[in-house]
Amino acid sequence: MRELQGDDSSRKSPPSDSVVKNSSPIDYEHSLKSLQDERTLNYPNKQFNSENPSSYYNMDDSGELCNFELEKDSLESMIHESSTALSAQSNTAQDGDQLASSSTISKDHSETLDNKLNDSKILIKKASNSFANFSESVRSSTIVAYSQTPTQRLQGLTSISSSSFDDGSYGSRRISFNSQGVSGRLRRNMDSTVIIPSEDEDLQLPSNSNSNVEYGPFDSTTFDRQLSIEVNQPVGAMSLSPCGRDIALASRYGLLVLDLDNPYNPPRMLRHSTPWEVADTQWNVHAARDQWVVSTSSQKTIVWNLALPNDRAIEFMLHGHTRAVTDMNWHRQNPDVLATCSIDSSVHCWDLRSPRFPVNSFYDWHNGATQVKWNYKNPHILASSHGRLVRIWDDRYGSAPLHTIKTSENITKINGLEFNRACETRLLTCAMDRTVKFWNYEKSTEEPEHLITTDSPVWKARFTPFGDGVILMPQRGDNSVHMYDCRNLDKEGPRAVHRFAGHTDQVKEFLWRCRGEDVFDRDLRDFQLITWSKDHHVRLWPIGNDILNSMGHDRTKPVPFKLTRLGAKYRTYSREPLKQSLINTECDSSDAMNSFDSNFGAERANTSDLSRGFVAFANRKKSKYNLPGSSGFMTRSTKSTNPMTPLNWLRGISMGRLGNADWEVPQNLGEELSWIGQKYSNVSFEKIDVAERTCTISLNAPILPDDGYAYIRLHVYFPNNYPISATPVFQLERSSAFNDEQFNYVFNTLTSISDQCISSHKYCMDACLSYLSGNLSVDEIWKLGFQKDNSDSSSESSADIFQDVFPSMPDFRGGDRGLSHKHQNIPLPKTCAAIFCGNDELVCFFTIKADESAAQATANRETHGRQKLFESFGVLDSSNSVADSDSTNYDDENSLNRGGTSESDSEFIWDVDESNSGSIVFPKSKTSINLNNINSASASIMGSRFGAADIFMSKRPSTKGSNRPSILLSKPSHDFHVVRIISMSKYLPVKRALAAEYVVDTGDKVTVCNKNAEVSAKHNYYRLAKVWLMLGRLLGHLSRTENKDHINDEEAFPWLKSPLAKWVVNSLLDYYASQCNTQMLAMLACVLDIPNPKKQSGNTSADQVLFNQPKQVTEKLGVQLNLPKTKILEKVSSHSLAQITALREKEPKDADSTYSKEKIFSATSTVHLQLMDYDKQNNDFVDAQEIAYTKLLQQKFIQWRATYAEQLDLWGFFIPKLEMLKFNAHEFSSPSEKTLVNHCNSCNSTTSNTRICEKCYSLVPRMSCTFCCLSIHGLCIVCGLCLHVMHEDCYKEWFSNGDSISQSCSSGCGCKCQFQHMSLEKV
């Protein structure tokens, strides 16, 4: 037999086709295959490399390559098996020699066996070296997959390549790994996207307590429910993870990662402070890179790796733009390719495998880029929007665009752009011109296929992932998201399918969350809409089958397009990865609870990294440039005004109910902790983790004798079956403040209370904290919470039952425990209150004791079952009624007749417990409110039942202070809360009926007086009718006798020439001012007024004309009307060049309505316009006084009309309101006499055309365009009447349409700016 040679040089290549089968039962291939099969059996998720037996690699579900460390026993077993294979081959070789000597085996066969023996020798040698290195280094490095040659890469690593593409310029690159020692810092291959941590940095995501249970999207508790989450952060963009479980909210303070399946857990905060708003954030849409999130930071682009710790989560920082980045989009086929666009008109394509420079760039050279999107079908096509143009680019075509789509003839801005998922050449655009256009650039780039025209500019428009439709999001004027069916655009046009209403401010982003994508032959996907609004709320909207069917969704057909999210592992990145060395997997349940650190605890440990800034994409070693305070990137220290504590986070979550679930009972552990956290203000929640079902609370509890307090810290662990069958585990920390006997008493009492709550399937934390806070004794808790309704059915008394449940224990508090500490830590509730509404109604509530009749009525109602109560959410509307559909079951006094339809007072009484005395509650009706009709007059705001689909329209029960009723209470108390709505119309001088029919202006003032006299007589106000008739005759006489050509233009009021007219006007104004009748004062101001007079000096500003009056004239008039600042007064001069300083008077405190505490007119103030003596010899002096008198009276007229216009707005009379405000617009001077001034918000002074106030030296804000709402720099167009300003281009665009809407001012003030004098000013 030949000597076995271990040198590789002695090896010969085996023959390719002259292999003779060996008769031995064990050959080389069989032994090696057996070794591989055993390795596969022991490690089913691992792969064995036959070329290198000491190397293994692991493939997870997402296609990523994971690390796998060889254990000692694995190496020993491998060496033993290899030795066995070698021995078998040696025996085979001996047999081969014998056969060769007998000339039965050929020479070639012997050489083949020798080569195989050499291979076995080499295999054992490599395994022994690996084991020796493993023992010497004491597991100092991680052994990972190692590919030596390109051939081995293709053979062994084909399955773990990034992805494969069809002839794309962004082809896949094979991943190479280095088996050499890894340093202590985090290292990565420049050509790889796989992080290779060292042994001491074995990172993993923290799992929940039930990590051994497979959790999927169909196990989600929030997918089928409406959910509202309040996030008090300046969030600029939102994105969704590939699996649909997490959302990323990007703000100026960093990145928030929120788990939608565990919304009660505070989000993970990756801090990065920046002074710039985040324009966009995008989660990687591919399953292979589900840990990547990209966001903008001015001209930079940040790529976050959520699989890394928070202090090193920034993996890449892309810097290629010179202006702010406006949009980003991941490639739809390649997970490593990203496209970004910027205001600098450039579009960059980045390959994150070499992120130093963009791999491709496109430029428009004229307009900045606002949107960029990759094609869903073609991996080489992408589109970008520049102004009103859409450029279609091909990365194989060069720098010139493939197609250019001109979306509009006018100057506009494209806000949204998206390709169709099913057709390669179709896309849609939405723009500021209030249109949504559908394009097919293969057919035409000039005319769209279809067009949708809306009432307001469209901020975003996208195709729906189901059916054939679009979903639109307005930019302003509407806080809803609209869904349209687009199947019959040619014949019927778009059909509105649904309106998602509920946000109170503009919606900024919407996303689609789906599940059920793993079925290929049918489309069984479920959908949920996620929206983010400027009201700081994330809301989830389930999509029902009725909406899917109305959009043409067919579940029997397969999905018509490729799903990039398919195969994504359903996991969350809402928790920071923890190092393996910090996790103790062998601790028991109590130790695990004590050693558990919440997400906020981990965040506090990283607060030192707030100002660290970015770290280079590949160079992660620490240097002086990475130290706090020495960052080379722009950061800003911020201080949150509302710290996001766990309790504050819980308060902002509202989850819908399924079916007829009770709103007074928490539906899960998160709601229970949220409710009790708001009810008990003296309890401090140190740690809350709903996912791990633990919390830690502390408080000063009155558990010591003689009313003594002791500090208590309580750890609570809630099992999964709580509160159905499992009791929470309490761990009370011992303290020197109380002895062991007192400690045992408190602990046993808490356990007994929780056991009794669980026996009734009730939540127990409310009862436990009521006992610890001293609000209720154990006896009271038992009587209120666990006493049966039918008490006489048992022979035992409640005291006997209590003694059986709670054995005799010493009372360590001393005194009467039921009285000494009851409610001592809770402030007294408000038992009565009253407030005026804007519709002439007074709403008040108060508490009364129940009499016998009321008690009888309560008993009658209890026969029908206790009604569920919830707090009304809206403002009282006079047109709505809250009469229950089953009102026959109740007394007549329980119906609420609104004062808007009747002059009589209305009253509502309902039985609630005493702790709810500060809330206004109403019984639920049997009908629900449609989301589309929530603002209509037919929708009943109060007394309507909100189901699971209507939680955004309602508020859950009051949760402030102690107003929440105890969860334990099942019996109504003996107090009644009365809510009364009183109509005050007969006590107020202003009359709504008159305002509805009064005529403000018809051109002839005599006709106005006669018509108003008829209206007053019609409603039986005969005194007012006489006043109007008298005033009409007086003005008619003046118009006949006075020659208008001889009237001095500076005398604004022609009735000044008549002593009788002056006396009559003076008497009327004096009388109605004393009566506080703003209605008559405003109407008289309209009738007695004429267009504004000419000014004496062309250089005098509008403010000087109105308010620079001689002091003696003001004193002679003898009245100062202190009008409160109303909304109308603020809106009169909005977007104007000249601000009226007199109208910006101080706002009174607590002026919540028109009739506030500070009266519109002082009771002692009178308007006495003293007559002037025209017999004086100095006529010039008299004329000067008349001019001053006229200007001061104009000021009063403006204030009266503005106040009355505010009242008309509250009544809903918008046309008379605009007619009233037009008179105020006429009071300004003509455009030729205007000078450009700014108004300082700090000192209320007017300045010249400068940015710095000349009086207080504060920054004066620039004027904004009424069309695009952007600040104005340079030339602008100024209207001579309403004083609104617009950019020159915006002015041309607005008035170029030629429709009826664009003929008036773009601000909506009603001014016909196009036909008035327009002036060109420079700002």
Swiss-Prot record:
Gene3D superfamilies (UniProt xref):
YVTN repeat-like/Quinoprotein amine dehydrogenase
Record's compositionally biased regions (Basic and acidic residues)? 1-11, 27-40
Q: Does the keyword Metal-binding apply?
A: yes
Q: Which organism is it from?
A: Schizosaccharomyces pombe (strain 972 / ATCC 24843)
What ranges does the record list as Low complexity composition bias? 12-21
Q: What is this protein called?
A: Uncharacterized RWD, RING finger and WD repeat-containing protein C11E3.05
Q: Where are the WD repeats?
A: 271-314, 320-360, 364-403, 409-449, 453-494, 502-551
An example Pfam family from this entry, by short name, is WD40
Residues annotated as carrying Phosphoserine in the record are: 24
Q: What does it do?
A: May be involved in telomere capping.
Q: Which GO terms describe its molecular function?
A: signaling adaptor activity; ubiquitin protein ligase activity; zinc ion binding
Where the record annotates domain RWD, the positions are 671-779
Family per similarity comment: Belongs to the WD repeat WDR59 family.
Tell me which UniProt keywords the record has, alphabetically. Metal-binding, Phosphoprotein, Repeat, WD repeat, Zinc, Zinc-finger
Which lineage ranks, top first, belong to the organism behind this chain?
Eukaryota, Fungi, Dikarya, Ascomycota, Taphrinomycotina
Segments of this protein annotated with the region Disordered = 1-57, 79-112, 879-904
Composition bias of kind Polar residues appears in 42-57, 80-105, 879-888
> Between which residues do disulfide bridges form?
none
| Ranges annotated as RING-type zinc finger | 1265-1309
One GO process term, biological-process aspect: positive regulation of TORC1 signaling
Q: Which cellular components does GO assign to this protein?
A: fungal-type vacuole membrane; GATOR1 complex; GATOR2 complex; Seh1-associated complex; vacuolar membrane
